[in-house]
UniProtKB/Swiss-Prot annotation:
GO terms of molecular function: phosphatase binding
UniProtKB keywords: Cytoplasm, Cytoskeleton, Repeat
Major location (coarse): cytoplasm
Function summary: Plays a role in the dynamic structure of centrosome-associated contractile fibers via its interaction with CETN2.
Highest taxon listed in the record's lineage: Eukaryota
Assembly and interaction partners: Interacts with CETN2 (via C-terminus).
Lineage, top ranks: Eukaryota, Metazoa, Chordata, Craniata, Vertebrata
Cellular component terms per the entry's GO annotation: centriole; cytoplasm
Name recorded for this polypeptide: Protein SFI1 homolog
UniProt keyword Disulfide bond, yes or no: no
Amino acid sequence: MEKKIGSRSFRDGVVKKPCSPKTLPLKKSSAFSGIQREPSRSCHSIYYHASQNWTRYRLQELRIRCVARKFLYLWIRVTFGRVTPSRARIFHEQKILQKVFGEWREEWWVSQREWKLCVRADCHYRYYLYNLIFQNWKTFVHQQREMRKRFRIAEHHDTKQKMCQAWKSWLIYMVSRRTKLHMKTTALEFRRQSVLCFWWSKWRWRLGQAHAEHALHAVAVKHRALSLQLQGWLRWQEQLLISQRDRRKEATAVQHYQHWQKQRSLKAWLKYLQICRVKRWQNEMAVQFHRATVLQIHFCDWQWAWEWRQSLSAHQALVVKLAGRMVLRRAFTHWKHYMLLQAEEAAQREAAAEHRQHYLLYSCFRAFKDNVTQARLQQTRKKLAQQLRDTTLLHRFWNLWQSRIEQREERVQTPSLHAALSHYRVTVLHKCVRVWLRYVHKRQWQQLLRARADGHFQQRALPAAFYTWYRGWLWHQQRRILHTKAVRFHRGTLEKQVFALWRQKMSQHRENCLAERMAILQAEQQLLRRFWFVWHQQAAVCQLERQQQAMAIAHHHSGLLRRAFCIWKESTQGFRIERMGRAQAAHFHSAQLLSRAWSMWRECLALRLEEQQKLKCAALHSQCILLRRALQKWLVYQNRVRSVLREVAARERQHNRQLLWWALHLWRENTMARLDGAKKTSQARVHYSRTLCSKVLVQWREVTSVQIYYRQKEAAALREARKALDRGRLQNWFQHWRFCSQRAAQQRFQLGQAAQHHHWQLLMEAMARWKAHHLGCIRKKFLQRQAAQLLAQRLSRACFCQWRKQLAVRKQEQWGTARALWLWAFSLQAKVWTAWLGFVLERRRKKARLERAMQAYQQQLLQEGATRLLRFTAGTKAFRQQLQAQQQVQAAHSLHCAVRHCAELWKKKVLGPGKTSQPPAPTTFSKRVTFKDSFLSGHAAEAGDATQETKKLRAPPSQGVLGSLAGAAGEPCHLDLNAARSSRKQPRRPSFLLERLGSQRSPEWYSLGEQQLEKPPEEESTALLGGSSLTRPFLPGVLPNVPGPKLPPTASPGLELLPPSSIMPHAAGGTARVSAKPSIPGPQPWGCPSLPRDLDPQLLPGDSISTRTEPVYGSEATGHTELEAELEGIQQQLQHYQTTKQNLWSCQRQANSLRRWLELSQEEPKSEDLHLEEQVKTELEEVELQVQQLAKELEAQRQPVGTCIARVRALRRALC
């Protein structure tokens, strides 16, 4: 195990899949295999050709492997803890697989359950169909068997009858042959005796032949007559069926024609209503347009007159003012007294007029009501005449009332018209201007509010409305699906009910058809039996008369009977085949006839209600004609009323215009006549007249507005009264028409039902009587002649009735089972639906719980990762300081000469070429060491590492820590280890720490990271390295206990050299460590910690030495302090640049993660994540602003950092 682990080394410092120490021997990844192959190549260069050094090299290699293995285990444990990423990944994959498998198992169980239910329903339906088919096939087989048995019995009986007939005919033939032989012998003997007897016998034989032919001809004529009668009966039956078919067709045609007439009349009525509406709308639009045009014309005339008057008033302003003031003063005094009197008279007149108008309207309404009640019993013409009389009276009253109002207004307004017109024009103009300004301001404000509302709607209300619309659309879709399902179920139930009714009616119709056919067949059999009885009597009479003719007649009769039986058999077989074919056609074409069942049922109802519809159509036609005439007359009346109103309005306008022009003319003449007298008196009373004029105008405006309001109110009341009157009249007409139509339809329907019931009762009574008579006749004849056949028929009928009852019971049972199965299927479907709904709800709850658990788990992981990362950074810092101290102690002896040489060169350059320093005393090596490490090489290496990490510059591998160790030991294998170590990368942060890292930043983390970094590494290194204190300050007599060869102590009896650490940067190692660390996204204080600026001086070994060594010369001390201050400033600048750069990287990664999260959330939008998305957007904006600021700072710091790096390089070159 040790060999396998020891053979592995670091390649690039990255372990992609780190494992615990227990699982390392079992898992060999490609990375470790590649790492394992590298030391083999490097070890080939390690070995020397000398054989005496092989053992030492081998021991050193094993030691290095043990140290590397130990550091690897420590790094894995510190980085990942007790649980490695591979095991965590495996556990996470197992959990995901278990979750996916659980969901899949639930979905599989639901799908299996649904599949089983579907298969069970299909199997049940197939079993039901198979059972139904099997039952039908069984009944069909039973019917076929019974038919075969009947055919066999009939054939057996036929063969027996044929055999009997053949035997009888053979016996008759034998008897006839014997008689013929006997007659031949006798005839021959007689011929021998006498020729006369021969001729006599021949004559007699011919006479018998003639009689036989005559009898046969008579029988043939009778048979011909019977056949013709039968053919006539069949033709009559066909004609009867054809006539019934024609009647049905005529009934359907009449029904269709009535329906078409109805539809046509309804369309005409609707068209007429539409035309009336259009005409009414056109009339209203015409009235409005006429009003608008008239108003515009009057306004234009008034505007023109006002402009003309204004032009005149511009020339005669003073004259008009003085005359107007005097006239207004006088007019106001007279008008005030006159208005007081007129107000009382107007109030009395208005009260009287209102009382009279109310009385007239009340009397008109009462008379109209009485006339309407009386007109219901009279004809329509009298109603129209009464209506015209009422309207003429109303027009007369209206004209009288209007003429009186006009006369009263003329009397009131004549004295004050000339003063009101000018003021009215001015006030109207001011009012128009104010209204227009208000309208403009209101419109501007509305536009501003509308713009704000549109912006608010687009920003806030539009997404909410879209979301509500989307939810409403989903709810509407679900409701539509449920509605379609309900409609389908209702349609299926209706189809089943209609099919059941149709099937019952078809069965009844089939039974009726079968009864009619059986009656026809029985009538035919009765006729055949009658003819047979008559013929049998005649044949018996002939047999009594002549036996020879009886034999021929019996033979012919038997032939006729055989033919009749064959015909009857063929007819019965044809009927049976036709019946079976119809049954099969009805059975196989039931699916096609199902869609036509409803139409057939409607046709049957239409045939029954044919007479009622005819009467209804006639009544409706007459009522439509009456309504049309009434509406035409009412429209003519309305047109006349409108024309009268238009004429009245035109006359009113013309009269007002004439009055206005007359008043203006009179006012002009009066003003021109009184100009001279008004000039003197108007100047003293200007102020008084103005005040009085304003008050008078205010009161006049109020009075005129009240009068206009009363006029408008009266006109509106009159219009409403007219509308109410017309509406009540139409409502009464419509109610009376509807009541009459309903009563007539109810009477017709009752009469039709009564007639149909009476016909049905008569038909049933006649059918019952015919059945009783027919059964009596059948009983009598069957009891007399065919008792055996009657018994067989009774038995067969009883069996058939029982079979039919059993078949009906079976059908009912099958229908009941089918109905129960359908109900069970629907209940099962409802249960499955509820179970599926519960499953979906439980699944959503489970998903929500899992999401909450995942969020809590992610937060917990983030906290744990942050704490572990802080601990790791503190441990790595302590470990690196310890390792640096150990390597410096081990390399002190090997690099002591180089340090001395560098110090002497530095002294020469600092003191100048003229100054000479004292030669150093010879150093003797002893157990005591003055300073323990070559700080020049260590700090130079660290500075080189820092510059290498900041500017990606290549440095020789001997400047690293392991390189100095290898140089001290004299082993070249350490060079490769140092190169691998220097090129190693730090461990990556897990992926779960990258999510939403910027949202959890707080100042507490910064303080926590600084506190953990500022802790002494002694407390954390005791657990890692077994309590060995590696971070103690380097005192002169104390050395840390580290593995490795001990160096011999050196004594310095003379002047001690100044340490190189005094001129090197104190925190170069820290800078190198910071630069060597990878940039991890997240906040800088705990994601990527940096060394604090105020470090403890005991932590740096160089500072501890420099504090002990005091400078000899003052110039050297001043030079050292200036150089140290410069290097500290360079260090601070580089450190600040590095921190800003790492902060920029972390902010950029945080912004990228936030953008990715936003893209993912926008791909699957949810209503709960809207607030969270807004927070993330604001956070993203803050991070982007921070990125921009950091980028600007980096741009500003690039030039000073470049100068600092150039300065450090120059110092290194100078020291080397």
